[in-house]
Amino acid sequence: MKRIATTLTALLLMAGTATAQDYGQTRTLKIWDNKTAPHGNGIATPEREPEKNRLTDVSEAVLYIFPAAPEKATGQAVVICPGGGYVKLCIDYEGYEMAQWFAEHGITAAVLKYRMPNGHPEVPLEDVEQA
């Protein structure tokens, strides 16, 4: 029984790692927890994905780092803030795919999954300033 539990744990850890690496990011950083952020957005519901790669109800800011290809690294970096009209984040083609392009061209990219404003316009601005 112990061997089965160990095997299942290892498989779950590998599956989580594979999911985190789907787009090539090598590091994930929480910008801050809701206790240290200057303002909260009042969203109490869990983050949702009503459409594929479209996030809503984001209440935790996270930075996904895509390092430049070492042989092409220029020493430059960019922070990408995906659009969505402050209602959702189009995190794939306006975030991850752009970051991959920059990384392939020697520029380290960081995709910011910023908190939705939910009537508090200062919240996403604080996230990008902190990033």
Give the predicted meaning of each segment.
Residues K2-A10:
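Sec-dependent signal peptide recognition
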Residues L11-A18:
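Hydrophobic h-region of N-terminal signal peptides that target proteins for export
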Residues Q21-K72:
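N-terminal cap/lid segment of alpha/beta-hydrolase-fold proteins
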Residues T74-G83:
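Short beta-strand element of the alpha/beta-hydrolase
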Residues A77, A103-A110:
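A fold-wide structural signal in alpha/beta-hydrolase
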Residues G85-V87, A109:
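Serine-hydrolase catalytic-loop signature spanning alpha/beta hydrolases and amidase-signature enzymes
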Residues L89-D92, E97, L112-A131:
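Catalytic nucleophile-loop/oxyanion-hole region of alpha/beta-hydrolase
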